[in-house]
Amino acid sequence: MAATTRQIIDATPIIDADTHVIEPADLFTSRVSTTKWGELVPHVRWDEESAEELWYFGDKKIYAAGLASGARWHEYPPDHPRRLADSDSRNWDAVERVRHMDDFGVRAQVLYPNIGVFQVNEYIGMNADPALVLACVQAYNDFLIDWSATAPGRYVPLMTVPFWDLDATMTELVRSRDAGHKGIVFPARMEDFGLPALHDQHWDRFWAAAQEMQLSINFHIGSGNIPMFGTASGRHLGYAWTGTMLFQLNAAAIASLIFGGICQRFPSLDFVSVESGVGWIPFVLESMDWQFHNSGVIAHHPEFDLLPSEYFARQIYSCFWFENASARSAIEQLGSEHVLFETDFPHPTGLTPGPASSAMAPREHLYQALDGLPAHDIRNVLHDNAARLYHLDS
């Protein structure tokens, strides 16, 4: 008798392709010299005006410390814990996190930052000492290795890099790869930082190094200046509006990778579009193929040896979490080899049931979303693709 969808999912060691570590308040102050740089080192302190803990760079208010700690919180986002200590300990405690993973049937989690890459543009805008910013990047990368070491085999750390300085980036690639990082978190819109666009050949030595080291490039939504939608319509509506539209930035990044010739020039380099969903991808690829054929690209650019959809199938992955029918349809249209599953834990709209969330537990959601798919497709999406991409032992 053929196994049911539920049986296949229950037998699969799920690799969650997008989760976040809520950075502890002393992450940087415990690793970067406050004797040398004082309060310029990122730190958390109470802000009387907003009545909450904030991350500060010097005297500049950057980010609510509890903003991303939405899992099991009792208020709808953008409301959030006012103090880190008020949030669920599984958001930031590595040992407690493993218990959460076991409860929800997740074998391993790929780890992304909150403040680590998303707010670095603030430092660049402050013209901070480059040595300080580099020290912060290294401190985060080292912290993540130490955090992951509490549960070997359960966490997949991804490095951040000082991308504004390519020489420093090349050095950090080697240092963090040797320490155990499995991929690179990279901004999708370099123009937000006053740097050349992704497709500019300025980045070619970075792509070449990542390709040689077999390190994937991971584009997480929001890793730049986040455009806000519907802000005049109310906090909760604006939050939903913005969260819905952020995938567009990653769609533009995929177009840059393909039309900009990056996939063509670096055929063994893998890319991941993170927290951006998958339902829209078949349309975008069909559109890219159509435009490719009907804009004379094949005739005028013989260097492109594949269609856009074929470059995607060879080198680009994307992740889904809440989708049901659109995820199943995308898998059926694209094939299962480049689709990953994520929960976005512990972000507010991730797959964590709670008093202010309609989410089901991950496996319960997957029973519906993947119902009827062949066993090899389910295993690809839940385990095999991520294991291959991040070079994990089975």
Language-model segments: what does each one mean?
Residues 26-29, 121-124, 229-232, 283-287, ...:
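Short aromatic-enriched loop/helix-cap "lid" or pocket-rim segments at secondary-structure transitions
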Residues 82-91, 127, 155-167:
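Active-site mouth loops of central-metabolism enzymes
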Residues 23, 112, 187:
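Conserved residues at the C-terminal ends of beta-strands
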Residues 76-82, 117-132, 167:
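Surface-exposed, active-site-proximal loop segments in enzymatic domains
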Residues 3-5, 132-135, 148-156, 161, ...:
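Catalytic pocket-lining loop regions of alpha/beta-barrel enzymes
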Residues 124-129, 233-243, 358-365:
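Short glycine/proline- and charge-enriched loop/turn segments
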Residues 112-117, 221-227, 347:
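Short glycine-enriched loops at secondary-structure junctions
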Residues 2-13, 24-80, 85-88, 92-108, ...:
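Mid-to-C-terminal alpha-helical segments outside catalytic/metal-binding sites
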